[in-house]
């Protein structure tokens, strides 16, 4: 069953596509052997660059998995300000130590060159949805469904707010520090 969810911003109605969470994963992945001394240790840790394709446009994002990430832990979707690469944000924002301290995975989205596109919010929602689906697919790690968090900074707050409103049943909490007035 396909469900469409809508958000009305300034009289423009935007939809979020099919919320089917099953992905057709085509990436070959080699999993290391489980550690019998520490079977809960994550297979993958550190930074993993990922890519999604929306309407033939490829966009990147980063996963950061802490060294002691639990079997099913929290995930924080971060929307930095305009024109900040996910790598720069991860290295300079102070979020890596927070992730290691709290054992929360970080999913760092990136604006396109020129910044987050408020005029075409649907393309940003589609990007966010693709990142969300790929992140929760349990390929590299497993997030607990009750602990998806969303944070937006600067102009990234606008996109984070729009996406979180469309997915209020999925996002446990949202924090915004920037321009997020959707009117």
Task: Tell me what each language-model feature is.
Residues 39-56, 114-128, 132:
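N-terminal-biased segments
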Residues 68-72, 117-154, 170:
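Gly/Ser-rich "nucleophile elbow"/oxyanion-hole loop immediately N-terminal to the catalytic nucleophile
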Residues 1-75, 151, 155-163:
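A domain-start/cap signature at the N-terminus of enzymes
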Residues 66, 79-83, 109-112, 151-155, ...:
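Active-site-proximal beta-strand/loop segments in catalytic clefts of secreted hydrolases
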Residues 146-183:
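Primarily recognizes the serine-hydrolase "nucleophile elbow" in alpha/beta-hydrolase
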